[in-house]
Amino acid sequence: MFGCLVAGRLVQTAAQQVAEDKFVFDLPDYESINHVVVFMLGTIPFPEGMGGSVYFSYPDSNGMPVWQLLGFVTNGKPSAIFKISGLKSGEGSQHPFGAMNIVRTPSVAQIGISVELLDSMAQQTPVGNAAVSSVDSFTQFTQKMLDNFYNFASSFAVSQAQMTPSPSEMFIPANVVLKWYENFQRRLAQNPLFWKT
């Protein structure tokens, strides 16, 4: 039903079922993992109104599991990428794996998936720094940066009559900055990653 992928490692598709509605994947040598992908295999969908809460567990200094909610997978969003590199310290959160008798070893973390009602999942709050930045947030940042630059540069605009001749300084016409701004916005709207080519 589920798969788990870590860069540079084989895909895991044999989750250990620890309860009727709970599954775990072992992540050996978890200290070297930055991101993990959790996905549905496409063979069995969730029942109507259900989804999977995805948790990350690592052993604390006493070897006790610390569980943190990463996010969710659903029939409508069958895969998700989570950043776990910053989660290996900190406090755990409420989780459904507490009473489970799951075999653990010191350098092994786990990804847990709990099948739950979509309504109850919507009321849970994943740990903040588990989400991977998306193109949308990058696009928003770029748009804000463009606006800020244009507003800053425009605040220095003067007409030719107001200019004081200064042979050592170069001046850029405001319409050139506006043309660049509009061109950059157009290209960003067409392809948010155009600047990489």
UniProtKB/Swiss-Prot annotation:
Give the keywords, sorted. Cytoplasm, Disease variant, Leukodystrophy, Nucleus, Protein transport, Transport
Key word tRNA processing present in the record?
Answer: no
Q: What induces it?
A: Following heat-shock treatment.
Pfam families registered for this protein in UniProt: Hikeshi-like_C (PF21057), Hikeshi-like_N (PF05603)
Its main localization is cytoplasm
Q: Name one GO molecular function term.
A: Hsp70 protein binding
Claim: Cytoplasm is one of the keywords in the record: yes
- What results from changing residue 55 to A? Reduces the nuclear migrating activity
What function does this protein fulfil?
Acts as a specific nuclear import carrier for HSP70 proteins following heat-shock stress: acts by mediating the nucleoporin-dependent translocation of ATP-bound HSP70 proteins into the nucleus. HSP70 proteins import is required to protect cells from heat shock damages. Does not translocate ADP-bound HSP70 proteins into the nucleus.
Give the disease association.
Answer: Leukodystrophy, hypomyelinating, 13: An autosomal recessive neurodegenerative disorder with infantile onset, affecting mainly the central white matter. Clinical features include early feeding difficulties, global developmental delay, postnatal progressive microcephaly, truncal hypotonia, spasticity, and variable neurologic deficits, such as visual impairment.
What is the name listed in the Swiss-Prot or TrEMBL entry for this protein?
Protein Hikeshi
The protein's organism comes out as Homo sapiens (Human)
What lineage is this protein's organism placed in? Answer: Eukaryota, Metazoa, Chordata, Craniata, Vertebrata
